[in-house]
Amino acid sequence: MSDTEDLAALNDRLMAKNHALAEALNRAGKELTKAKSRLAQLAQPPLTFATMVKVDSTRTDADGIQHASAEVISGTRRMVVPVASNVNAARLTAGATVMLNEKLVLVEQRDADTVGQIRSVKQVLDDGRLIVTDASGNPVLIRRSGALAYADINQGDRIIVDPSVRLAIEALPAEGDKDLVLEETPDVTFADIGGLDSEIGRIRDAVQLPFRHRALFERYDLKPPKGVLLYGPPGNGKTMIAKAVANALCEGGYDSNGDGSISPAETRVKGVFLSVKGPELLNKYVGESERLIRLIFQRARERAADGNPVVVFIDEMDSLLRTRGSGVSSDVETTIVPQFLSELDGVESLDNVMVIGASNRVDMIDPAVLRPGRLDVKIRVGRPKTNQAIAIVDHYLTDDLPLENGVDAHALSAVLVHDIYGTSERRHLCDVQEENGQWHALFLADVVSGAMLKNIVDRAKTRAVKESIETGSDVALTVPLLAAAVEDEYRETRDSMADVDPEQWSRINGMDPIRRIRTAE
Protein backbone atom coordinates (compact mmCIF):
# COMPACT_ATOMS: atom_id res chain seq x y z
CA MET A 1 0.00 0.00 0.00
CA SER A 2 1.35 3.43 -0.95
CA ASP A 3 1.85 6.33 1.42
CA THR A 4 -1.12 8.11 -0.19
CA GLU A 5 -3.44 5.28 0.58
CA ASP A 6 -2.17 5.10 4.16
CA LEU A 7 -2.79 8.78 4.68
CA ALA A 8 -6.31 8.48 3.21
CA ALA A 9 -7.16 5.62 5.57
CA LEU A 10 -5.78 7.55 8.54
CA ASN A 11 -7.82 10.58 7.51
CA ASP A 12 -10.98 8.46 7.38
CA ARG A 13 -10.31 7.12 10.84
CA LEU A 14 -9.69 10.58 12.23
CA MET A 15 -12.87 11.92 10.63
CA ALA A 16 -14.91 9.09 12.15
CA LYS A 17 -13.32 9.83 15.49
CA ASN A 18 -14.18 13.52 15.14
CA HIS A 19 -17.82 12.69 14.35
CA ALA A 20 -18.01 10.48 17.42
CA LEU A 21 -16.45 13.18 19.59
CA ALA A 22 -18.85 15.79 18.16
CA GLU A 23 -21.84 13.59 18.95
CA ALA A 24 -20.52 12.96 22.45
CA LEU A 25 -20.00 16.68 23.00
CA ASN A 26 -23.53 17.36 21.71
CA ARG A 27 -24.99 14.79 24.09
CA ALA A 28 -22.94 16.18 26.96
CA GLY A 29 -24.17 19.68 26.14
CA LYS A 30 -27.79 18.52 26.25
CA GLU A 31 -27.26 16.72 29.54
CA LEU A 32 -25.57 19.82 30.95
CA THR A 33 -28.53 21.94 29.86
CA LYS A 34 -30.92 19.50 31.57
CA ALA A 35 -28.81 19.54 34.72
CA LYS A 36 -28.78 23.34 34.74
CA SER A 37 -32.56 23.33 34.30
CA ARG A 38 -32.98 20.94 37.19
CA LEU A 39 -30.66 23.00 39.36
CA ALA A 40 -32.54 26.17 38.45
CA GLN A 41 -35.82 24.49 39.38
CA LEU A 42 -34.39 23.31 42.68
CA ALA A 43 -33.04 26.77 43.37
CA GLN A 44 -36.47 28.42 43.02
CA PRO A 45 -37.69 29.81 46.34
CA PRO A 46 -40.86 28.31 47.82
CA LEU A 47 -44.24 29.97 47.44
CA THR A 48 -46.37 30.62 50.51
CA PHE A 49 -50.09 29.86 50.73
CA ALA A 50 -52.32 32.64 52.02
CA THR A 51 -56.01 33.47 52.15
CA MET A 52 -57.26 36.49 50.26
CA VAL A 53 -59.22 38.98 52.41
CA LYS A 54 -59.77 42.01 50.15
CA VAL A 55 -58.08 44.31 47.63
CA ASP A 56 -56.51 47.12 49.64
CA SER A 57 -55.70 49.54 46.80
CA THR A 58 -55.33 49.57 43.03
CA ARG A 59 -54.33 52.07 40.31
CA THR A 60 -53.07 52.05 36.77
CA ASP A 61 -50.18 54.30 35.69
CA ALA A 62 -49.79 56.20 32.43
CA ASP A 63 -48.19 53.19 30.78
CA GLY A 64 -51.19 51.01 31.64
CA ILE A 65 -49.33 49.04 34.29
CA GLN A 66 -51.34 47.93 37.31
CA HIS A 67 -50.16 48.87 40.79
CA ALA A 68 -52.24 47.08 43.45
CA SER A 69 -52.00 45.76 46.97
CA ALA A 70 -54.14 43.21 48.80
CA GLU A 71 -54.91 42.25 52.38
CA VAL A 72 -54.14 38.58 52.99
CA ILE A 73 -53.82 36.21 55.93
CA SER A 74 -50.98 33.72 56.03
CA GLY A 75 -51.25 31.44 59.02
CA THR A 76 -51.99 33.88 61.81
CA ARG A 77 -50.27 36.85 60.08
CA ARG A 78 -52.48 39.55 58.62
CA MET A 79 -50.59 41.48 55.91
CA VAL A 80 -51.00 43.97 53.08
CA VAL A 81 -48.84 42.73 50.17
CA PRO A 82 -48.19 44.02 46.63
CA VAL A 83 -49.94 42.30 43.74
CA ALA A 84 -47.87 41.27 40.72
CA SER A 85 -48.71 43.27 37.61
CA ASN A 86 -49.66 40.13 35.69
CA VAL A 87 -52.37 39.26 38.28
CA ASN A 88 -55.69 41.00 37.63
CA ALA A 89 -56.58 42.61 40.97
CA ALA A 90 -60.23 42.98 39.92
CA ARG A 91 -60.56 39.20 39.88
CA LEU A 92 -59.18 38.61 43.35
CA THR A 93 -62.00 37.31 45.58
CA ALA A 94 -62.24 37.11 49.35
CA GLY A 95 -61.63 33.61 50.65
CA ALA A 96 -59.62 32.45 47.63
CA THR A 97 -56.22 30.84 48.09
CA VAL A 98 -53.36 33.03 46.82
CA MET A 99 -49.63 32.41 46.44
CA LEU A 100 -46.90 34.72 47.78
CA ASN A 101 -43.31 34.59 46.53
CA GLU A 102 -40.20 34.99 48.66
CA LYS A 103 -40.62 38.78 48.60
CA LEU A 104 -44.24 38.42 49.76
CA VAL A 105 -45.64 39.52 46.42
CA LEU A 106 -48.99 38.04 45.41
CA VAL A 107 -48.18 36.17 42.20
CA GLU A 108 -51.11 33.78 41.70
CA GLN A 109 -54.73 33.13 42.72
CA ARG A 110 -56.14 29.63 43.12
CA ASP A 111 -59.53 28.19 44.04
CA ALA A 112 -60.59 28.36 47.66
CA ASP A 113 -59.45 25.47 49.82
CA THR A 114 -62.07 22.74 50.20
CA VAL A 115 -60.80 21.47 53.54
CA GLY A 116 -60.48 23.15 56.90
CA GLN A 117 -61.99 23.58 60.32
CA ILE A 118 -65.76 23.20 60.65
CA ARG A 119 -67.82 25.61 62.74
CA SER A 120 -71.52 25.85 63.56
CA VAL A 121 -73.37 29.09 62.89
CA LYS A 122 -74.80 30.47 66.12
CA GLN A 123 -76.15 33.76 64.77
CA VAL A 124 -76.37 35.63 61.46
CA LEU A 125 -75.96 39.41 61.93
CA ASP A 126 -77.84 42.00 59.90
CA ASP A 127 -74.71 43.00 57.97
CA GLY A 128 -74.08 39.38 56.93
CA ARG A 129 -71.30 38.60 59.37
CA LEU A 130 -71.53 35.32 61.25
CA ILE A 131 -71.10 34.34 64.88
CA VAL A 132 -69.82 30.76 64.84
CA THR A 133 -68.89 28.34 67.60
CA ASP A 134 -66.44 25.49 67.86
CA ALA A 135 -67.14 22.09 69.43
CA SER A 136 -66.61 23.55 72.89
CA GLY A 137 -69.09 26.35 72.29
CA ASN A 138 -66.55 29.21 72.05
CA PRO A 139 -68.00 31.98 69.83
CA VAL A 140 -66.04 33.82 67.09
CA LEU A 141 -67.21 36.63 64.79
CA ILE A 142 -66.17 36.08 61.16
CA ARG A 143 -66.80 37.51 57.68
CA ARG A 144 -68.16 35.75 54.63
CA SER A 145 -65.93 34.94 51.68
CA GLY A 146 -66.86 36.11 48.20
CA ALA A 147 -68.39 32.73 47.40
CA LEU A 148 -70.78 33.07 50.35
CA ALA A 149 -71.58 36.77 49.98
CA TYR A 150 -75.19 36.09 48.99
CA ALA A 151 -75.59 32.54 50.29
CA ASP A 152 -78.58 31.70 52.49
CA ILE A 153 -76.99 30.76 55.83
CA ASN A 154 -79.10 30.06 58.90
CA GLN A 155 -78.51 29.31 62.55
CA GLY A 156 -77.26 25.77 63.04
CA ASP A 157 -75.68 25.49 59.57
CA ARG A 158 -72.10 24.27 59.27
CA ILE A 159 -69.35 26.13 57.45
CA ILE A 160 -65.66 25.68 56.64
CA VAL A 161 -63.45 28.50 57.93
CA ASP A 162 -59.95 29.54 56.89
CA PRO A 163 -57.00 28.58 59.15
CA SER A 164 -57.11 31.94 60.93
CA VAL A 165 -60.86 31.51 61.62
CA ARG A 166 -61.66 34.93 60.14
CA LEU A 167 -63.48 33.97 56.95
CA ALA A 168 -66.28 31.56 56.10
CA ILE A 169 -65.02 29.71 53.03
CA GLU A 170 -67.74 27.20 52.20
CA ALA A 171 -71.20 26.20 53.46
CA LEU A 172 -71.67 22.50 54.13
CA PRO A 173 -74.87 20.48 53.77
CA ALA A 174 -77.10 20.36 56.84
CA GLU A 175 -75.46 18.43 59.65
CA GLY A 176 -75.99 14.70 59.53
CA ASP A 177 -78.43 14.63 62.42
CA LYS A 178 -80.50 12.38 60.15
CA ASP A 179 -78.39 9.63 61.67
CA LEU A 180 -79.82 10.62 65.03
CA VAL A 181 -83.33 11.52 63.93
CA LEU A 182 -84.79 9.05 61.48
CA GLU A 183 -87.91 10.20 59.71
CA GLU A 184 -89.62 7.03 58.62
CA THR A 185 -92.85 5.09 58.23
CA PRO A 186 -92.34 1.75 60.03
CA ASP A 187 -93.98 -1.35 58.56
CA VAL A 188 -95.14 -2.68 61.96
CA THR A 189 -98.90 -2.58 62.60
CA PHE A 190 -100.94 -3.28 65.72
CA ALA A 191 -102.01 -6.56 64.11
CA ASP A 192 -98.38 -7.71 64.25
CA ILE A 193 -98.29 -7.43 68.04
CA GLY A 194 -99.67 -10.25 70.12
CA GLY A 195 -100.62 -10.41 73.78
CA LEU A 196 -100.58 -6.65 74.46
CA ASP A 197 -104.21 -5.72 73.77
CA SER A 198 -104.59 -3.72 76.99
CA GLU A 199 -101.38 -1.75 76.46
CA ILE A 200 -102.22 -1.12 72.81
CA GLY A 201 -105.66 0.15 73.77
CA ARG A 202 -104.21 2.62 76.26
CA ILE A 203 -101.63 4.04 73.91
CA ARG A 204 -104.13 4.32 71.06
CA ASP A 205 -106.40 6.30 73.35
CA ALA A 206 -103.51 8.56 74.33
CA VAL A 207 -101.98 9.08 70.90
CA GLN A 208 -104.64 8.57 68.25
CA LEU A 209 -107.80 9.93 69.86
CA PRO A 210 -106.59 13.55 70.06
CA PHE A 211 -105.81 13.56 66.34
CA ARG A 212 -108.85 11.57 65.26
CA HIS A 213 -111.37 13.64 67.19
CA ARG A 214 -109.92 17.13 67.38
CA ALA A 215 -113.36 18.77 67.49
CA LEU A 216 -114.47 16.68 70.46
CA PHE A 217 -111.29 17.42 72.36
CA GLU A 218 -111.80 21.13 71.76
CA ARG A 219 -115.47 20.82 72.74
CA TYR A 220 -114.47 19.40 76.13
CA ASP A 221 -111.48 21.74 76.47
CA LEU A 222 -109.22 18.71 76.68
CA LYS A 223 -105.55 18.93 75.84
CA PRO A 224 -103.83 15.88 74.37
CA PRO A 225 -100.99 14.42 76.46
CA LYS A 226 -97.53 15.81 75.73
CA GLY A 227 -95.84 12.49 76.15
CA VAL A 228 -96.17 8.77 76.75
CA LEU A 229 -93.66 6.55 78.54
CA LEU A 230 -93.47 2.85 77.69
CA TYR A 231 -91.49 1.06 80.36
CA GLY A 232 -90.84 -2.45 81.55
CA PRO A 233 -88.36 -5.31 81.18
CA PRO A 234 -86.55 -5.62 77.84
CA GLY A 235 -87.84 -7.60 74.90
CA ASN A 236 -91.57 -7.23 75.51
CA GLY A 237 -92.70 -5.00 72.66
CA LYS A 238 -92.16 -1.37 73.71
CA THR A 239 -90.43 -0.41 70.48
CA MET A 240 -92.90 -2.42 68.39
CA ILE A 241 -95.82 -0.53 69.95
CA ALA A 242 -94.18 2.80 69.14
CA LYS A 243 -93.60 1.71 65.54
CA ALA A 244 -97.21 0.57 65.21
CA VAL A 245 -98.38 3.97 66.47
CA ALA A 246 -96.15 5.62 63.89
CA ASN A 247 -97.51 3.38 61.14
CA ALA A 248 -101.09 4.29 62.04
CA LEU A 249 -100.28 8.01 62.16
CA CYS A 250 -98.34 8.03 58.91
CA GLU A 251 -101.05 6.22 56.97
CA GLY A 252 -103.74 8.70 58.01
CA GLY A 253 -107.46 8.25 57.30
CA TYR A 254 -108.41 6.62 60.60
CA ASP A 255 -111.30 4.26 61.18
CA SER A 256 -113.08 6.42 63.75
CA ASN A 257 -116.39 4.57 63.67
CA GLY A 258 -114.95 1.12 64.18
CA ASP A 259 -116.58 -0.18 60.99
CA GLY A 260 -114.04 0.92 58.42
CA SER A 261 -115.78 4.23 57.67
CA ILE A 262 -114.82 7.78 58.57
CA SER A 263 -117.40 10.10 60.06
CA PRO A 264 -118.25 13.30 58.13
CA ALA A 265 -116.77 15.45 60.89
CA GLU A 266 -113.56 13.50 60.85
CA THR A 267 -110.46 15.21 59.53
CA ARG A 268 -108.13 12.95 57.63
CA VAL A 269 -104.61 13.58 58.81
CA LYS A 270 -101.27 12.00 58.04
CA GLY A 271 -98.61 12.03 60.71
CA VAL A 272 -94.83 12.00 60.89
CA PHE A 273 -92.66 9.68 63.00
CA LEU A 274 -89.26 10.94 64.17
CA SER A 275 -87.15 8.19 65.69
CA VAL A 276 -84.36 9.42 67.98
CA LYS A 277 -81.40 7.27 68.99
CA GLY A 278 -81.12 8.33 72.61
CA PRO A 279 -77.54 7.26 73.43
CA GLU A 280 -76.17 8.86 70.25
CA LEU A 281 -77.39 12.27 71.40
CA LEU A 282 -74.83 12.19 74.20
CA ASN A 283 -71.74 14.16 73.24
CA LYS A 284 -68.57 14.89 75.20
CA TYR A 285 -68.49 18.52 74.06
CA VAL A 286 -70.27 21.04 76.25
CA GLY A 287 -73.57 22.19 74.78
CA GLU A 288 -73.58 19.78 71.84
CA SER A 289 -76.21 17.41 73.26
CA GLU A 290 -78.44 20.36 74.12
CA ARG A 291 -78.07 21.70 70.57
CA LEU A 292 -79.13 18.35 69.12
CA ILE A 293 -82.20 18.28 71.38
CA ARG A 294 -83.14 21.75 70.12
CA LEU A 295 -82.73 20.58 66.53
CA ILE A 296 -84.98 17.58 67.13
CA PHE A 297 -87.82 19.66 68.51
CA GLN A 298 -87.29 22.32 65.86
CA ARG A 299 -87.75 19.67 63.19
CA ALA A 300 -90.84 18.35 64.96
CA ARG A 301 -92.38 21.85 65.07
CA GLU A 302 -91.66 22.36 61.38
CA ARG A 303 -93.39 19.08 60.49
CA ALA A 304 -96.34 19.88 62.75
CA ALA A 305 -96.82 23.43 61.46
CA ASP A 306 -99.31 22.30 58.79
CA GLY A 307 -101.53 20.54 61.33
CA ASN A 308 -100.22 17.01 60.91
CA PRO A 309 -99.46 14.97 64.04
CA VAL A 310 -95.80 14.35 64.81
CA VAL A 311 -94.51 11.63 67.13
CA VAL A 312 -90.97 11.96 68.49
CA PHE A 313 -89.90 8.51 69.65
CA ILE A 314 -86.91 8.41 72.03
CA ASP A 315 -85.63 4.89 72.61
CA GLU A 316 -83.49 4.13 75.67
CA MET A 317 -84.75 7.32 77.31
CA ASP A 318 -82.98 6.53 80.58
CA SER A 319 -79.59 6.97 78.87
CA LEU A 320 -80.47 10.53 77.86
CA LEU A 321 -82.63 11.88 80.70
CA ARG A 322 -80.94 10.35 83.72
CA THR A 323 -81.70 11.63 87.22
CA ARG A 324 -79.68 14.78 87.85
CA GLY A 325 -76.85 14.33 90.32
CA SER A 326 -76.52 10.61 89.64
CA GLY A 327 -73.46 10.85 87.36
CA VAL A 328 -70.32 9.01 88.40
CA SER A 329 -67.64 10.87 86.41
CA SER A 330 -69.70 13.75 85.05
CA ASP A 331 -73.12 15.30 85.35
CA VAL A 332 -74.05 16.02 81.74
CA GLU A 333 -77.66 15.29 82.65
CA THR A 334 -77.76 18.50 84.72
CA THR A 335 -77.98 20.46 81.46
CA ILE A 336 -79.60 17.90 79.14
CA VAL A 337 -82.67 17.36 81.33
CA PRO A 338 -83.46 21.10 81.69
CA GLN A 339 -83.05 21.56 77.93
CA PHE A 340 -85.49 18.72 77.25
CA LEU A 341 -87.99 20.09 79.78
CA SER A 342 -87.73 23.60 78.34
CA GLU A 343 -88.56 22.23 74.89
CA LEU A 344 -91.49 20.29 76.32
CA ASP A 345 -92.85 23.15 78.46
CA GLY A 346 -91.29 26.16 76.77
CA VAL A 347 -92.72 29.31 75.27
CA GLU A 348 -92.74 27.79 71.79
CA SER A 349 -95.84 25.64 71.51
CA LEU A 350 -95.60 21.93 70.81
CA ASP A 351 -99.03 21.70 69.18
CA ASN A 352 -99.52 18.43 67.28
CA VAL A 353 -96.26 17.05 68.70
CA MET A 354 -96.15 14.11 71.08
CA VAL A 355 -93.13 12.47 72.69
CA ILE A 356 -93.08 8.71 73.18
CA GLY A 357 -90.25 7.36 75.31
CA ALA A 358 -89.19 3.78 75.89
CA SER A 359 -87.03 2.61 78.78
CA ASN A 360 -86.05 -0.54 80.64
CA ARG A 361 -84.97 1.50 83.67
CA VAL A 362 -87.70 3.96 84.60
CA ASP A 363 -86.04 4.32 88.02
CA MET A 364 -83.09 6.08 86.34
CA ILE A 365 -85.17 8.76 84.57
CA ASP A 366 -85.26 12.17 86.25
CA PRO A 367 -88.51 12.57 88.24
CA ALA A 368 -89.13 15.98 86.69
CA VAL A 369 -89.54 14.29 83.30
CA LEU A 370 -92.13 11.85 84.64
CA ARG A 371 -94.42 14.27 86.43
CA PRO A 372 -97.97 14.97 85.08
CA GLY A 373 -98.01 17.59 82.36
CA ARG A 374 -94.91 16.17 80.71
CA LEU A 375 -94.98 12.42 80.20
CA ASP A 376 -98.63 12.21 81.21
CA VAL A 377 -99.31 8.60 80.27
CA LYS A 378 -97.14 5.84 81.67
CA ILE A 379 -97.75 2.35 80.31
CA ARG A 380 -95.99 -0.66 81.75
CA VAL A 381 -95.27 -3.34 79.18
CA GLY A 382 -94.66 -6.30 81.43
CA ARG A 383 -93.80 -9.93 80.89
CA PRO A 384 -96.50 -11.92 79.11
CA LYS A 385 -98.83 -14.19 81.04
CA THR A 386 -99.71 -17.63 79.69
CA ASN A 387 -102.58 -16.50 77.45
CA GLN A 388 -100.58 -13.53 76.22
CA ALA A 389 -97.63 -15.78 75.45
CA ILE A 390 -99.85 -18.07 73.36
CA ALA A 391 -101.11 -15.04 71.42
CA ILE A 392 -97.51 -13.98 70.78
CA VAL A 393 -96.41 -17.43 69.62
CA ASP A 394 -99.46 -17.61 67.32
CA HIS A 395 -97.84 -14.85 65.26
CA TYR A 396 -94.80 -17.04 64.57
CA LEU A 397 -96.36 -20.53 64.47
CA THR A 398 -98.95 -20.38 61.70
CA ASP A 399 -100.92 -22.99 59.76
CA ASP A 400 -99.05 -22.25 56.53
CA LEU A 401 -95.86 -23.77 58.01
CA PRO A 402 -95.00 -27.47 57.60
CA LEU A 403 -96.77 -29.06 60.59
CA GLU A 404 -97.27 -32.68 61.57
CA ASN A 405 -100.54 -34.19 60.41
CA GLY A 406 -103.58 -33.59 62.56
CA VAL A 407 -102.04 -30.78 64.60
CA ASP A 408 -102.90 -27.13 64.10
CA ALA A 409 -100.59 -24.22 64.84
CA HIS A 410 -102.58 -22.92 67.81
CA ALA A 411 -102.36 -26.29 69.54
CA LEU A 412 -98.58 -26.33 69.04
CA SER A 413 -98.39 -22.81 70.46
CA ALA A 414 -100.27 -23.90 73.57
CA VAL A 415 -98.01 -26.93 74.08
CA LEU A 416 -94.90 -24.78 73.63
CA VAL A 417 -96.06 -22.11 76.09
CA HIS A 418 -97.12 -24.61 78.76
CA ASP A 419 -93.68 -26.21 78.52
CA ILE A 420 -92.02 -22.81 78.99
CA TYR A 421 -94.27 -21.82 81.88
CA GLY A 422 -93.86 -25.07 83.76
CA THR A 423 -92.66 -24.82 87.36
CA SER A 424 -91.06 -28.23 87.61
CA GLU A 425 -87.39 -28.75 88.39
CA ARG A 426 -86.61 -29.11 84.66
CA ARG A 427 -87.37 -25.38 84.18
CA HIS A 428 -85.72 -24.21 87.40
CA LEU A 429 -83.10 -21.55 86.60
CA CYS A 430 -81.71 -20.56 89.98
CA ASP A 431 -82.51 -19.49 93.53
CA VAL A 432 -82.42 -15.80 94.41
CA GLN A 433 -82.05 -14.12 97.78
CA GLU A 434 -84.10 -10.99 98.34
CA GLU A 435 -83.04 -8.07 100.52
CA ASN A 436 -84.95 -9.51 103.48
CA GLY A 437 -82.74 -12.60 103.31
CA GLN A 438 -85.40 -14.99 102.03
CA TRP A 439 -84.63 -17.36 99.19
CA HIS A 440 -87.06 -18.38 96.48
CA ALA A 441 -86.87 -20.29 93.22
CA LEU A 442 -86.69 -18.57 89.85
CA PHE A 443 -88.08 -20.40 86.81
CA LEU A 444 -87.85 -19.81 83.08
CA ALA A 445 -91.38 -18.37 83.16
CA ASP A 446 -90.15 -15.60 85.48
CA VAL A 447 -87.78 -14.20 82.85
CA VAL A 448 -89.69 -14.97 79.66
CA SER A 449 -90.27 -12.14 77.18
CA GLY A 450 -91.81 -11.70 73.78
CA ALA A 451 -88.36 -11.67 72.23
CA MET A 452 -87.50 -14.95 73.97
CA LEU A 453 -90.69 -16.59 72.67
CA LYS A 454 -89.84 -15.58 69.12
CA ASN A 455 -86.29 -16.84 69.59
CA ILE A 456 -87.53 -20.26 70.76
CA VAL A 457 -89.78 -20.62 67.71
CA ASP A 458 -86.88 -19.57 65.46
CA ARG A 459 -84.70 -22.24 67.08
CA ALA A 460 -87.27 -24.91 66.21
CA LYS A 461 -87.59 -23.62 62.66
CA THR A 462 -83.80 -23.59 62.23
CA ARG A 463 -83.58 -27.19 63.43
CA ALA A 464 -86.35 -28.15 60.98
CA VAL A 465 -84.49 -26.45 58.12
CA LYS A 466 -81.29 -28.36 58.90
CA GLU A 467 -83.13 -31.68 59.03
CA SER A 468 -84.91 -30.82 55.77
CA ILE A 469 -81.52 -30.26 54.11
CA GLU A 470 -80.29 -33.63 55.36
CA THR A 471 -83.40 -35.57 54.31
CA GLY A 472 -84.12 -33.68 51.08
CA SER A 473 -87.77 -33.01 52.01
CA ASP A 474 -89.73 -30.72 54.32
CA VAL A 475 -89.52 -31.76 57.97
CA ALA A 476 -92.65 -30.90 59.94
CA LEU A 477 -92.57 -28.78 63.07
CA THR A 478 -93.43 -31.20 65.84
CA VAL A 479 -93.80 -31.15 69.61
CA PRO A 480 -90.36 -32.80 70.10
CA LEU A 481 -88.73 -30.13 67.90
CA LEU A 482 -90.34 -27.35 69.91
CA ALA A 483 -89.44 -29.05 73.20
CA ALA A 484 -85.79 -29.26 72.09
CA ALA A 485 -85.85 -25.54 71.27
CA VAL A 486 -87.25 -24.74 74.72
CA GLU A 487 -84.56 -26.89 76.32
CA ASP A 488 -81.80 -25.08 74.41
CA GLU A 489 -83.17 -21.69 75.47
CA TYR A 490 -83.49 -22.86 79.07
CA ARG A 491 -79.89 -24.09 79.22
CA GLU A 492 -78.48 -20.87 77.73
CA THR A 493 -80.51 -18.72 80.11
CA ARG A 494 -79.53 -20.84 83.11
CA ASP A 495 -75.83 -20.71 82.21
CA SER A 496 -75.93 -16.93 81.75
CA MET A 497 -77.34 -16.45 85.26
CA ALA A 498 -73.99 -17.42 86.77
CA ASP A 499 -72.27 -14.31 85.40
CA VAL A 500 -74.80 -11.55 86.09
CA ASP A 501 -74.66 -8.86 88.75
CA PRO A 502 -77.71 -9.64 90.95
CA GLU A 503 -78.67 -6.07 91.79
CA GLN A 504 -78.26 -4.70 88.29
CA TRP A 505 -79.95 -7.71 86.69
CA SER A 506 -83.00 -7.42 88.94
CA ARG A 507 -83.40 -3.71 88.15
CA ILE A 508 -83.13 -4.19 84.40
CA ASN A 509 -85.67 -7.02 84.51
CA GLY A 510 -88.13 -5.10 86.64
CA MET A 511 -87.87 -7.32 89.70
CA ASP A 512 -87.51 -6.68 93.41
CA PRO A 513 -83.89 -6.08 94.48
CA ILE A 514 -81.83 -9.28 94.67
CA ARG A 515 -78.76 -9.73 96.84
CA ARG A 516 -77.46 -13.11 95.67
CA ILE A 517 -78.08 -15.68 92.94
CA ARG A 518 -77.52 -19.41 93.43
CA THR A 519 -77.61 -21.20 90.10
CA ALA A 520 -79.24 -24.59 89.60
CA GLU A 521 -77.01 -27.59 89.09
Curated annotation (Swiss-Prot):
SUPFAM superfamilies: P-loop containing nucleoside triphosphate hydrolases
GO BP: modification-dependent protein catabolic process; proteasomal protein catabolic process
Cited InterPro entries: AAA+_ATPase (IPR003593), AAA_ATPase_domain (IPR050168), ATPase_AAA_core (IPR003959), ATPase_AAA_CS (IPR003960), NA-bd_OB-fold (IPR012340), P-loop_NTPase (IPR027417), Prot_ATP_ID_OB_2nd (IPR032501), Prot_ATP_ID_OB_N (IPR041626)
A GO CC term assigned to this protein in UniProt: proteasome complex
Domain of life: Bacteria
PANTHER family: AAA-FAMILY ATPASE, PROTEASOME-ASSOCIATED ATPASE
Description of how the protein assembles with itself and partners: Homohexamer. Assembles into a hexameric ring structure.
Name of this protein: AAA ATPase forming ring-shaped complexes
Gene name of this polypeptide: arc
